């Protein structure tokens, strides 16, 4: 097939596979590209760009995360490991015959519009497994290369004589054997890895600059994210009610040494981990203040304390990274692209991003619904349908409010955060217009 009649789809992780399935389902011709030799993206630990580690599991339950049309087996754990998830994505790809649409081992080097017209074609330069470069033009582009691969590595004043790594380099707790370890950041990965370190390290401390809300994985013997949600509460009331319930189950993290959060619940992504509080309570992990400076093996903290470490592991998150596209194509505004519904580039008809969205409880089905909308829109553009033309006009205008009434922290990792309910409603309503 002539490539100018195809959509180029970049990535075969969860969002990329969702895109492939929906384009396939709606009869939109496409060519997929995946730099690795297999599907799974982040969840394929063998992928050089994967940042998962040996002990990694979902922090949301399988029933709140899976693709609705392809449920995980009952035999799969409530919170599956990366191994189970890779099996799941392989099975998903095989069940729907998606592999045949991909060129594996092929890295996209550059994506550029042929012109600045909204309906422009797109020129892709790729590098195959043999190192040969190839350039072709496509009708449109769907970017689904993930959001958790490019480390956000901080810099600290002073000089450090020990080992300084980002969690993206962490794979196994063997790294900690006999070492004095400082983990910087207490997000979900930081807390998971601190728990890993307890069993191998000589000492484990965790440095934080703000407080957190800690959500247990199980409540009354059931995955916590499967409870509640049937009654829609205003944001202010849900924050108050859920924070109270959390204190009943998890206690007050301030008593464990964490700062009191300077924000209300859900204004930043909660930490789904109660084991970290268990180990702090048992003296296995010590909470430290923010870092002031490094001095040899000594770390000096902003509360005036100091301690020596052999290894500092920065659990400081990731940056959005679309190196093959000029920032202006994606309408970058500050810390992230400004896209309509976190999907559509306002200046181009057929440039979309899947997976550039974060929300507590959105799951892969939320990304699938993004892909469903993209497939319907692209198909509608081909026929000039009224819903497609209406969406084309809407995405060039002011974006809808997707906050659900929450005041999210102005942090880089929150730059593309939305409220799950507000977001899914907006995406579903947009897709329903094509029915």
Give residue spans per PLM region.
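Flavin (primarily FAD) cofactor-binding/catalytic cores of flavoenzymes
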Residues: 2-55, 71-212, 216-218, 231-387, ...
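Active-site segment of extracytoplasmic enzymes that catalyze sulfate/phosphate-ester chemistry
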Residues: 64-65
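The conserved 3'-phosphoadenosine-5'-phosphosulfate
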Residues: 384-399
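Short, surface-exposed amphipathic charged segments that create phosphate/polyanion-binding patches used
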Residues: 221
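Flexible "cap/lid" subdomain of the alpha/beta-hydrolase fold that forms the substrate-access gate
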Residues: 57-61
């Amino acid at each position: 097939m002539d490539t100018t009649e195809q959509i180029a789809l970049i990535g075969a992780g969860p969002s990329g596979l969702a895109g492939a399935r929906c384009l396939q389902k709606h009869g939109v011709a496409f060519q997929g590209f995946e730099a690795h030799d297999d599907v799974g993206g982040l969840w394929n630990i063998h992928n050089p760009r994967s940042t998962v580690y040996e002990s990694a599991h979902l922090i949301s339950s399988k029933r709140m995360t899976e693709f609705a049309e392809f449920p995980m087996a009952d035999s799969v754990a409530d919170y599956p490991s990366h191994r189970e998830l890779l099996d799941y994505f392989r099975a998903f790809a095989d069940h729907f015959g998606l592999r045949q649409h991909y060129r594996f081992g092929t890295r996209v080097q550059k994506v550029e519009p042929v012109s600045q017209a909204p309906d422009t074609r797109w020129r892709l330069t790729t590098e195959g497994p043999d190192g040969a470069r190839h350039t072709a033009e496509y009708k449109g582009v769907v970017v689904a290369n993930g959001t958790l691969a490019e480390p956000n590595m901080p810099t600290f004043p002073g000089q450090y004589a020990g080992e300084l790594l980002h969690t993206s380099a962490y794979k196994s707790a063997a790294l900690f054997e006999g070492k004095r370890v400082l983990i910087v950041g207490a997000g979900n990965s930081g807390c998971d890895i601190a728990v890993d370190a307890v069993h191998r390290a000589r000492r484990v401390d965790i440095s934080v600059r703000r407080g957190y809300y800690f959500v247990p994985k199980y409540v009354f013997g059931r995955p916590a994210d499967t409870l509640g949600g049937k009654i829609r509460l205003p944001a202010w009331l849900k924050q108050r009610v859920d924070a109270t319930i959390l204190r009943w189950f998890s206690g007050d993290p301030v008593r464990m040494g964490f700062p009191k959060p300077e924000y209300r619940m859900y204004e930043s992504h909660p930490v789904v981990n109660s084991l970290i509080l268990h180990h702090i309570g048992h003296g296995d992990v010590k909470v430290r203040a923010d870092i002031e400076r490094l001095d040899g093996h000594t770390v000096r903290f902003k509360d005036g304390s100091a301690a020596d470490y052999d290894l500092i592991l920065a659990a400081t998150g990731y940056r959005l990274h679309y190196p093959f596209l000029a920032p202006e194509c994606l309408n970058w505004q500050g810390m992230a692209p400004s896209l309509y519904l976190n999907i559509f580039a306002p200046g181009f008809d057929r440039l979309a991003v899947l997976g550039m969205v974060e929300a507590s409880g959105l799951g892969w089905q939320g990304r699938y619904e993004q892909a469903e909308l993209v497939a319907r829109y692209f198909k509608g553009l081909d026929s000039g349908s009224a819903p497609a033309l209406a969406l084309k006009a809407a995405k060039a205008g002011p974006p809808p409010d997707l906050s659900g009434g929450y005041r999210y922290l102005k942090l880089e990792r929150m730059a593309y955060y939305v409220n799950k309910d507000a977001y899914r409603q907006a995406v579903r309503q947009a897709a329903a217009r094509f029915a």
